Amino acid sequence: MKKAILSVSNKTGIVEFAKALTQLNYELYSTGGTKRILDEANVPVRSVSDLTHFPEIMDGRVKTLHPAVHGGILADRNKPQHLNELSEQHIDLIDMVVVNLYPFQQTVANPDVTMDEAIENIDIGGPTMLRAAAKNYKHVTTIVHPADYQEVLTRLRNDSLDESYRQSLMIKVFEHTAEYDEAIVRFFKGDKETLRYGENPQQSAYFVRTSNAKHTIAGAKQLHGKQLSYNNIKDADATLALVKKFDTPATVAVKHMNPCGVGIGDTIEQAFQHAYEADSQSIFGGIVALNRAVTPELAEQLHSIFLEVIIAPKFTDEALDILKQKKNVRLLEIDMTIDSNEEEFVSVSGGYLVQDKDNYVVPKEEMKVVTEVAPTDEQWEAMLLGWKVVPSVKSNAIILSNNKQTVGIGAGQMNRVGAAKIALERAIEINDHVALVSDGFFPMGDTVELAAQHGIKAIIQPGGSIKDQDSIDMANKHGIAMVVTGTRHFKH
């Protein structure tokens, strides 16, 4: 029977994953809070102390730092000497390590954090197990992100958990532990940047970097321009998160944390033009992110309008010469790798909230057409583009999109029909190929009726209202194709 050690601070999906491992004939060992959760869920699990024959001591500071754990992880299965030494010491092989670390970054993000709190959230045993398992990836599977649970299970069931895939997991581990250690160094060095002011001039502010990863705003290389402001940083982060969702050339423009124009195309120049045309007024003074290198041709287009920040994975030398003619525009070079951090947090009075990032994308095959009329191919393309964008828009959110750009955005309204009115009234075009996209369900049929009055012929929304049928009936009445996804995307 294979053995797995599970010790996680982020408990997302761990119970389901552990149950599946037991069904695949894994014997589970765990520590502290993880073991308690598995026990409560009636998942068969043993204490790591059963491996080490040594109790957890010093309030859990020493749990897994033991030869019985690390010998079982690090042994090279191809070396008889290693296996003989394990046998002599009565040490069992460990085949899988599932660990994520104490939430140091989240802890120190609290402005009132004490030094003792920070120190207690420095993980020692977790990184040690992760690094050991990652080093021995040829024989041991190591998982640091809950997002990888499902694929690991699929590969176990299909007997395709091969060395190449384990190596990809190994890379994630060393990226994760490097960022973790860097966050610790930055905190204790006091690595914070004083900003001119906060959201408004009467508010003081500073920027604390907990990572210097090249795919983050904190790790961006600023090539030109003034110091980033508090609002620049927030808007740039929102812009970057959205543009990374696109594989095709894409451009995102953001104002006040909301997209004002999103465009895709065969080239990045075409994508920018589509984003600009989506709302040529609101982009003025905004933040623009592009997921392809900025060429001289594109730089001329960008230079022609006032922008606060331009983000791209690369700027050619000629493009830089053009853009640097404006002394204040901030130019940020950022790796477009998708952020592997699965959590986000926000401070509230007396504490902070932590949640998984809203990265889930519903596959098209799981979406359901609920009306008599089905979407055309072009309407499907418009829906899927809008569905990528809508999680980045403040709720209540309604987007209008075609297959190359957003054409109208209604954001941050207290009722859904109000958001729809804004999107419809500001739309640069409405025709049979434009889709209406909603981040939440329709509580009644009025939004669909309003859409019909403006000529909308395709709608995508989560569904889930007790009055879903009213909206479906209204769509059928007007010959509108409606798709439900089963997943909402509120953003506050």
Swiss-Prot record:
PROSITE patterns: MGS (PS51855). Residues 1-144 form the MGS-like domain. Pathway: Purine metabolism; IMP biosynthesis via de novo pathway; 5-formamido-1-(5-phospho-D-ribosyl)imidazole-4-carboxamide from 5-amino-1-(5-phospho-D-ribosyl)imidazole-4-carboxamide (10-formyl THF route): step 1/1; Purine metabolism; IMP biosynthesis via de novo pathway; IMP from 5-formamido-1-(5-phospho-D-ribosyl)imidazole-4-carboxamide: step 1/1. GO terms for molecular function: IMP cyclohydrolase activity; phosphoribosylaminoimidazolecarboxamide formyltransferase activity. It catalyses: (6R)-10-formyltetrahydrofolate + 5-amino-1-(5-phospho-beta-D-ribosyl)imidazole-4-carboxamide = 5-formamido-1-(5-phospho-D-ribosyl)imidazole-4-carboxamide + (6S)-5,6,7,8-tetrahydrofolate; IMP + H2O = 5-formamido-1-(5-phospho-D-ribosyl)imidazole-4-carboxamide. It holds the Pfam family AICARFT_IMPCHas. The keyword Hydrolase applies. One of its GO terms (biological process) is 'de novo' IMP biosynthetic process. The IMP cyclohydrolase activity resides in the N-terminal region. This is Bifunctional purine biosynthesis protein PurH. It comes from Staphylococcus aureus (strain NCTC 8325 / PS 47). The lineage of its organism: Bacteria, Bacillati, Bacillota, Bacilli, Bacillales.
